[in-house]
C-alpha cells in the first residue's frame, strides 16, 4: 500500500516544495508566461473558509467553497484541524472525513482520524501522494463529515495548507 500522508512537516518538506513549484508553474501558465509570479501561503480568506458549527450526531458541513480567481492558482499540500481541539481519541468525533471537490468531482478523500497524534495542538495531515493544484476559474469545495458524539454543538476550523501563485503585486493585505 502506498503512503498517503505524512505525520510531520519535516517528513513532508519535499512534497511542500514540490507543491509550491507546481503552483508557480500553473500560475505562470494561466498568465501566459508574462510577468513575475509570486507564491505565498494560502489563507482562509483566499478560500472563504471559516469556523463551522458541528451539530451532535451525524453531520456533513461545507468548510469552504468558491472559484479560483482569474490569474491565480491554488496548490494544496495538507489540512489541519485546529482550535478548539476535540480529542478524536476519546471518541468525541469519529469517522472524520474531509472530501475535496474540484470542478464538481471528488479528487481527494482524507480520513482525519488516522492522524490523531493525541496532542492538544491539533491534527495535521500532509498529503504524501499527489498534491491538489487548481487553476483559475475552477470551482472547489471542502466538505467535512463524521459523527459528533459529544451531545452538543462543537465549533471547528479546518485550515487548508497550501499556496497561491499569482502575479506580483496582485494581493493587497488590509491592516
Model-derived segments and spans:
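Beta-strand-centric surfaces of beta-sandwich/beta-rich domains
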Residues: 1-175
